[in-house]
Amino acid sequence: TLEEEYPVSGFGRGLKLKAKRVKGDGTVSRVTRSPGEVLLEYNSIAGAARGIGAALAKIECKESTPFKTLGIMLDVSRNMVMTVDHLKMWFRRLALSGYNMIMLYTEDTYELPDEPFFGHLRGAYTLEEIRELDEYAKCLGIELVGCIQTLGHLEQIIKWGGAYDKVRDTASVLLVDEPKTYALIEKMIAFWSEALGSRRIHIGMDETHDLGRGRFLDKFGYESGFELFNRHLGKVNELCKKAGLAPMIWSDMYFRLSNADQNYYDL
């Protein structure tokens, strides 16, 4: 996999790379150079990849981390998406830096069955493309995790009028308690459950400042954003459990909604 871009080969005539697996918590990577040879000691694929990065840079290192996960979120929701090949390039370089987890932030940039306007004109990834990326990431010791939106930041689909009017609260927020909302979210979750081997998923839900202030207010009257948020999260959590996934969310709205001025801090 690294051979696609870097001078690493099982049949090369350069320095001999000897690899030795060792025990250790977190990620362990040690590189020692001697004439004609590089010794790489590692405890995981991520540690080995970081060691190869050090070897390619012609440096020695002795490193370990106090944590098990070193991750990054790649935003593929701005304009058109990165191509699969370009993402693979990112994966290779992140592997050489010791990363073992990548989140793909996709608001609407993936295809859903019977949802032609979801990802329309945005270069949405197919199920097969995400599976291909997942297999590639595994070869590099990287866990690929879906990072989606299940409440706010969905203006790119809500803008398609008639297609998503029934699930619209505001211009970017989905309508809580609407059955069609949860039917759509279930499709989102099913896509990532089927596409990736990881049993983790990030379900977003950040920056929903106008939650309950649009069509929800017109239909049902005022209800506190905190109550709406909690109720919606509970329903989405059940959908994740049904798909065998462990969800995580951004934390900002719990700070904001529990503050009288919707700020992060009381000053």
Segments predicted by a language model, with ranges:
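Acidic, contiguous N-terminal accessory segments
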Residues: T1-E63, I249-L267
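Feature activates predominantly on carbohydrate-active enzymes
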Residues: S34-M248
